[in-house]
Amino acid sequence: MVEWTDAERTAILGLWGKLNIDEIGPQALSRCLIVYPWTQRYFATFGNLSSPAAIMGNPKVAAHGRTVMGGLERAIKNMDNIKNTYAALSVMHSEKLHVDPDNFKLLADCITVCAAMKFGQAGFNADIQEAWQKFLAVVVSALCRQYH
């Protein structure tokens, strides 16, 4: 089990409270699909992913980005039990969707980049980043649990 300091909880919950999941989710997933084009193979049913403009304008990408952020909200609400909270999601991504677990880290990094761009140094300083990335590392670990 992960131990969270009061400062980490405050930083994570404070950042989460400022994030607009309808904005950050689509941006982060779009960025992931553009920067790491091999991740597109998991989204064959999403239609046109042929260019950055097509990806950024794709409503299915945007909707799934919001879904991803909804999943993060579940982790936020269950910070002391993320692994169990994500158990079924880990099984689904491993056994049904066959997602390469390395891609979870790539998407987490894209979420971090989008948050940093949105809030800049004032709203996303090193202390906030440290706590946020610890949180996302726990989420990624929970998603990868079924793969071990």
UniProtKB/Swiss-Prot annotation:
One Gene Ontology molecular-function label: heme binding
Pfam families: Globin
CDD domains reported in the protein's UniProt record: Hb-beta-like (cd08925)
Annotated Globin domain residues: 3-148
Family matches, as InterPro entries: Globin, Globin-like_sf, Globin/Proto, Hemoglobin_b, Hemoglobin_oxygen_transport
Binding site for heme b: H64, H93
Keywords: Heme, Iron, Metal-binding, Oxygen transport, Transport
GO cellular component, one term: haptoglobin-hemoglobin complex
Tissue occurrence: Red blood cells.
GO terms classed as biological process: cellular oxidant detoxification; hemopoiesis; hydrogen peroxide catabolic process; oxygen transport
Alphabetized PROSITE patterns for the sequence: GLOBIN
Coiled-coil region list: none
Quaternary assembly: Heterotetramer of two alpha chains and two beta chains.
Family listed: Belongs to the globin family.
Function: Involved in oxygen transport from gills to the various peripheral tissues.
Protein name per UniProt: Hemoglobin subunit beta-2
Name of encoding gene: ba2
